[in-house]
Curated annotation (Swiss-Prot):
GO terms for molecular function: (3R)-hydroxyacyl-[acyl-carrier-protein] dehydratase activity; trans-2-decenoyl-acyl-carrier-protein isomerase activity. The keyword NAD does not apply. The gene is fabA. Keywords: Cytoplasm, Fatty acid biosynthesis, Fatty acid metabolism, Isomerase, Lipid biosynthesis, Lipid metabolism, Lyase. Necessary for the introduction of cis unsaturation into fatty acids. Catalyzes the dehydration of (3R)-3-hydroxydecanoyl-ACP to E-(2)-decenoyl-ACP and then its isomerization to Z-(3)-decenoyl-ACP. Can catalyze the dehydratase reaction for beta-hydroxyacyl-ACPs with saturated chain lengths up to 16:0, being most active on intermediate chain length. It is found in: Cytoplasm. Pathway: Lipid metabolism; fatty acid biosynthesis. This is 3-hydroxydecanoyl-[acyl-carrier-protein] dehydratase. Belongs to the thioester dehydratase family. FabA subfamily. Its EC number is 4.2.1.59, 5.3.3.14. GO terms for biological process: unsaturated fatty acid biosynthetic process. The active site is at H71.
Length: 172
């Protein structure tokens, strides 16, 4: 049985990356450096824009984060694809939180818009995931819209984020 808490610490997220949080058959978050959040501050089965589930997570920003040193030299900015990946990570994490089993894989996104950036001078990135639908059949899949905010200002939106849980990924 999954320990369904409303919030998770960095240690909890690292445990997920080791396959310890949702059990041996549950989905895992990536390990650092690809783990793109420091904590989950809220998870609910209701709420969000569609009242079908909501996740909010945060990443603390500091100038020493790995991506600022290489993207770009002399013009450091967090790659937008990392914010998108964080949203996919959270959709998969939510599926595990619901008790879903399998290996998480991003399946797509309908539309992404970038209207701002994360610079090394920022303090905090907030991710908000609004679930639209959960498919719990042979394929377990989450469909959600997401938002990325930096220091409280909306900078990315993603519609129709899709993540599936697979028992076998060898033919994927």
């Amino acid at each position: 049985m999954v320990d369904k808490r409303e919030s998770y610490t960095k240690e909890d997220l690292l445990a997920s990356g080791r396959g310890e949080l949702f059990g041996a058959k549950g989905p895992q978050l990536p390990a650092p450096n690809m783990l793109m959040m420091d904590r989950v501050v809220k998870m609910t089965e209701t709420g969000g824009n569609f009242d079908k589930g909501y996740v909010e997570a945060e990443l603390d920003i500091n100038p020493d984060l790995w991506f600022f040193g290489c993207h770009f030299i002399g013009d450091p900015v967090m790659p937008g694809c990392l914010g998108l990946d964080a949203m996919w990570q959270l959709v998969g994490f939510y599926l595990g939180w619901l008790g879903g089993e399998g290996k998480g894989r991003a399946l797509g996104v309908g539309e992404v818009k970038f209207t701002g950036q994360v610079l090394p001078t920022a303090k905090k990135v907030t991710y908000r995931i609004h679930f639209k639908r959960i498919v719990n059949r042979r394929l377990i899949m989450g469909l959600a819209d997401g938002e990325v905010l930096v220091d409280g200002r909306l900078i990315y939106t993603a519609n129709d984020l899709k993540v599936g849980l697979f028992q076998d990924t060898s033919a994927f």
